[in-house]
């Protein structure tokens, strides 16, 4: 019975789109088997896992930890390119047309790409994912876009933000 959570800002005043969020935290190779058993829907689970890898690699690994890809393109764009390659190879136009097996394969492609491009493996450990996501949300308080938004909206810097960790609800 895996516990998946979202990690979001709990700023005193809402700052729409300014603060980072990470969804599906806690989904690992081990926990996804329990989620497949619980939902009976492997495609849903593999899609949630690949989305976590993409979001985490971008928000936590690249942005928060400051790891920059050597070739210039951000990790999110590179992972989206891998998705496009797979859709083309399978002769489909939409993400939803990929099968559970396609998405399972894409997860491994994503993990390999993250390791190659960022030089660090995607954490297949729920606690590491959680602490990384929490740090990223706190860090997003001081991004250029968040600081600029606070200036425009007269939100004091010293207010800071909280981090909300909430159980994921799908439906």
Q: What does each model-identified segment do?
A:
Residues 1-171:
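Nucleotide/phosphate-binding sheet-loop regions of phosphoryl- and nucleotidyl-transfer enzymes
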């Amino acid at each position: 019975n895996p516990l998946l959570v979202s990690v979001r800002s709990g700023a005193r005043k809402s700052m729409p789109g300014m603060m980072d969020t990470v969804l599906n935290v806690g989904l690992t190779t081990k926990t996804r088997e329990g989620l497949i058993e619980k939902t009976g829907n492997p495609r849903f689970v593999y899609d949630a896992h690949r989305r976590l890898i993409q979001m985490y690699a971008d928000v936590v690994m690249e942005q928060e930890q400051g790891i920059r890809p050597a070739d210039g393109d951000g990790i999110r764009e590179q992972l989206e390119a891998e998705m496009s390659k797979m859709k083309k190879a399978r002769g489909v136009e939409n993400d939803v047309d990929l099968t559970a097996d396609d998405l399972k394969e894409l997860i491994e492609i994503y993990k390999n790409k993250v390791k190659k491009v960022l030089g660090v493996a995607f954490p297949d450990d729920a606690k590491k994912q959680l602490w990384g996501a929490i740090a990223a949300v706190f860090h997003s308080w001081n991004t250029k876009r968040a600081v600029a938004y606070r200036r425009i909206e007269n939100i004091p810097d010293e207010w800071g933000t909280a981090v909300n960790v909430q159980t994921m609800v799908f439906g």
